[in-house]
Amino acid sequence: MNLEPPKAEIRSATRVMGGPVTPRKGPPKFKQRQTRQFKSKPPKKGVQGFGDDIPGMEGLGTDITVICPWEAFNHLELHELAQYGII
């Protein structure tokens, strides 16, 4: 009669015994796209419904160069400008 208790066999939970040994692969790698694609069209420059004449700016013509981007897009909110990468 054997008085010793049976020894428990400890096995690793991560390794399967008897299966083929294959190298583990990491997560798939994704490439960054160079151009961004939006679900909606980006906004157009200029204020909607803006007339040709500006009070106090007579005689300059309608060819006004916009220096600041928020002057061309002042009809939009900041989060809309940031969504399309304007600011």
Swiss-Prot record:
Keywords: Acetylation, cGMP, Hydrolase, Sensory transduction, Vision
EC number(s) reported in the record: 3.1.4.35
Compositional bias per record (Basic residues), positions renumbered to this chain: 26-44
Enzyme class per UniProt: hydrolase
Keyword match Transport: no
Any one Gene Ontology cellular component term annotated for this protein: photoreceptor outer segment membrane
Positions of post-translational N-acetylmethionine modification: M1
GO MF: 3',5'-cyclic-GMP phosphodiesterase activity; cGMP binding; molecular adaptor activity; zinc ion binding
Annotated TM spans: none
Biased composition (Basic and acidic residues): 1-12
UniProt cross-references to Pfam families, sorted A to Z: PDE6_gamma
Family: Belongs to the rod/cone cGMP-PDE gamma subunit family.
Assembly, per entry: Oligomer composed of two catalytic chains (alpha and beta), an inhibitory chain (gamma) and the delta chain.
This protein's name: Retinal rod rhodopsin-sensitive cGMP 3',5'-cyclic phosphodiesterase subunit gamma
